[in-house]
């Protein structure tokens, strides 16, 4: 609670956007500010590598953990996870199902497939995965090699994710406009009570 508020205050009060207008900021604007040198920190993911490296050069960018004063975070690695998975449509024809499975196998085992995956998508969880040029993955691997732990996330575990997020975002926006203890208590409620409500609705 306190640690999250501290990092959120850091974001709000040191942003290129006025805290009162934080709900008008966009990801595209944040990316542009980073590329133009108007911002030095930009919270995003490995998918931003091409856009940032093209403008700034791979040697000028690095991904680091978000430090909030939480016990043990000095050994934290990067937050890493996915909300995507591969699936085969059970209603497709047998021929289409086989073609899909054959393609999946090709992507993760063949020279051409694994090269394409590394260059266009990054590392994949398979023994023959190639190392991508994306330095953000190298940063993550270096932290793991140094004995740091991975910070796992999986948004598909969030109950009623769209409704839950909407409640949290609304509370955070209200707090940005008026950074009071009462408004922060509403953020906490949106996360804690909101999760309980959405969990109950889906179980």
List each model region and its residues.
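Non-transmembrane alpha-helical segments in soluble domains
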Residues: 5-12, 31, 35, 53, ...
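Mature extracytoplasmic/periplasmic domains
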Residues: 31-32, 36, 47-51, 66, ...
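Alpha-to-beta junction loops
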Residues: 36-45, 59
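Pocket-flanking alpha-helical
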Residues: 49-55, 196-199
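Conserved C-terminal helix/tail region of periplasmic/extracytoplasmic solute-binding proteins
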Residues: 148-203
């Amino acid at each position: 609670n306190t640690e999250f508020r501290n990092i959120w205050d850091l974001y709000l009060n040191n942003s290129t956007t006025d805290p009162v207008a934080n709900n008008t900021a966009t990801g595209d604007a944040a990316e542009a500010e980073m590329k133009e040198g108007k911002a030095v920190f930009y919270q995003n993911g490995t998918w931003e590598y091409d856009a940032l490296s093209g403008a700034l050069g791979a040697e000028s960018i690095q991904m680091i953990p978000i430090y909030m004063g939480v016990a043990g975070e000095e050994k934290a690695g990067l937050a890493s996870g996915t909300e995507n998975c591969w699936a085969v449509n059970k209603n497709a024809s047998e021929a289409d199902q086989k073609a899909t499975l054959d393609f999946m196998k090709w992507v993760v085992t063949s020279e051409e497939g694994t090269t394409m995956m590394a260059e266009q998508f990054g590392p994949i969880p398979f023994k023959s995965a190639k190392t991508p040029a994306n330095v953000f993955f190298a940063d993550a691997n270096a932290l793991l090699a140094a004995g740091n732990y991975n910070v796992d996330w999986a948004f598909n575990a969030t109950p009623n994710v769209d409704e839950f997020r909407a409640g949290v975002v609304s509370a955070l926006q209200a707090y940005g406009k008026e950074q009071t203890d009462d408004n922060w208590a509403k953020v906490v409620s949106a996360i804690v009570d909101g999760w309980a409500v959405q969990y109950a609705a889906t179980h």
